[in-house]
Structures are given as C-alpha cells and as structure tokens.
Amino acid sequence: RQRQMCIRDRQLLNRQQELSISKSSAIGNVRIIDPAVTQPQPVKPKKALNVVLGFILGLFISVGAVLARAMLRRGVEAPEQLEEHGISVYATIPMSEWLDKRTRLRKKNLFSNQQRHRTKNIPFLAVDNPADSAVEAVRALRTSLHFAMMETENNILMITGATPDSGKTFVSSTLAAVIAQSDQKVLFIDADLRRGYSHNLFTVSNEHGLSEYLAGKDELNKVIQHFGKGGFDVITRGQVPPNPSELLMRDRMRQLLEWANDHYDLVIVDTPPMLAVSDAAVVGRSVGTSLLVARFLSLIHI
C-alpha cells in the first residue's frame, strides 16, 4: 500500500511538471496593433469656446438690463413734459463737461494725504469758466426770473429740488454769482441744515452759520460772510442741529428774511429737497418766488 502511494505521488509530480511546461510554452492570442497615443490638451472644458459663449451671453444680458432700466425708469426727459402740466420752465441748464472733469479729479484727490485738496482748489464754474454753456444758461435764467419777480411781494428766491442731488446748490450758487456780476447786492442763505455744503464750495468758515443764528447763539453780524470770489454775501448752514425743521419755523428765520429783503437786491435761499423733508415748505411761506430744479431723468414722471 505504501508503494502505491509513492507511485501516485510521483505521477502527480510528473503531471504538475508537464502542466508547468505547457503553461510556459503556450503562445497567447493577444497582440498590440497600435501603441496608445497620449493627448497633451484636455478634452474638456473647451476654454476658447466657453470664453466666446460667455462674452456673447454677457453682452446680451447687459443690453437687456440697460433696455429694461430705460423702460422702467420714467423721468423728465424734456421741458415739454413739465409744460404739459402747466409748470413754467424758466431755463434748461446743460451739464458742464469742464466742471464734471474737475469734480471727478478732485474726488480722486480726496484720497490723497494732502489736506489742501479737501478745502482748496474747489472749482466754482461762474468765476473759473464764465464762458461755459451752463453759465450762459444760468444767465438766461437770471433774465427770466427778473421779469417773473417784478410783481412778487419780496425779492426772496427759494431754490429747491425734488430729490437729493438734483443740482439745486449748483444752480443757486451760480445764479448768485451771475447776478452779483451785474452790480447787484446778493445774499446766499444755505438753509439745508442737514446736508448743506456751501461752506466747502465757497471756502468759508462754517463755525458760525444759520443754525447758530436761529438757535440764538449768534447775531447776524457774526454769521454773514463775504465770498470775494463770487462777489456776494453768504450765510452757511452752521453745525448740523438735531431739529432742523423746528429751527426754520422760529420767528428768527422770518426776521432774517425780512431784514435781508430790505438790505439786499436779491436773497437766494437754498433749501433741502422738497420730497425728502418738510424744510422747503416751511421756508416757502416767507418767500416771494420758488424755483424747483428737476434733474434729467431723476424726477419721477408726473
């Protein structure tokens, strides 16, 4: 029996060797036809195509947004829109490219470390560039107002706007300078006790102004300053009070306007926007003429 087991083991070993030899000598049926080719560029994303499509899509979206804004924003586009509602238009004042360029340059200089840019070299169009088309339009406004104010009860002119940044201070200050150039005595009162900036425009002190006078802290001789560059007198707004409307309702405001009416050929009062606060309505009770400044496309369509 032991001999049989030895014979069987020998047969298994022989069979294993035969299989190993057969496996080593077997020829496979797989062969390489072409070597693999590597692609140096990515298949996706296609950057050039995406950039072109993105540019075209962005262009369409931008044009659509501009058209939608133009259609939804209904503002005053022409004087005829106001005249159709019985509102008299005294002048149309174009934007001054000269002033706009220098204003943008000064805003850049505000970030400079040089303090002089904050208080000096502020352009005043009526004096620095009197031949500008905007100044010529204000001269036409002066002529129109001269005839319009001939039958009014006093020579006090209130200039206001419908909304902030309507250009009322530009119109009022330029008008004051233009009228002063015709040898008339003019007083400019900055009654915008919240955001008035005439002291920066005229480069005068704002320590003693209208708010101090109305509060009883200062007298008239202390708050009236002369703006030599423009040739007229100025009352700045003073320090910002906590109750502007209440100050303007005091008798001292009425007394100031009555005194100014007797001592000046024209009194120009620059007030806050009439749709924002009630200050303009308060001052309007004591003036003979009111002028509303409507900026192009900024006033909601009537």
Where are the regions a protein language model picked out?
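Non-transmembrane alpha-helical coiled-coil
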Residues: R1-Q4, R8-P35, P40, P79
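Hydrophobic anchor at the start of a short beta-strand
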Residues: V89-Y90, V186, V267, S290
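Membrane-interface helix-start motif
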Residues: T38-V51
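Soluble periplasmic/extracytoplasmic beta-strand elements of cell-envelope proteins
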Residues: V30-D34, Y90-T92, I156-M158, D233-T236
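Conserved catalytic-core segment of NTP-binding enzymes
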Residues: R73-E83, T203, A215, Q225-G228, ...
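Residue-level signature of catalytic and energy-coupling elements of molecular machines
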Residues: L12, I32, L82, L141, ...
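Short boundary/hinge segments that flank catalytic cores
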Residues: V52-K185, A191-S211, K222, P241-S245, ...
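Conserved helix-loop functional segments at active or binding sites
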Residues: N14-S22, T143-E151, L266
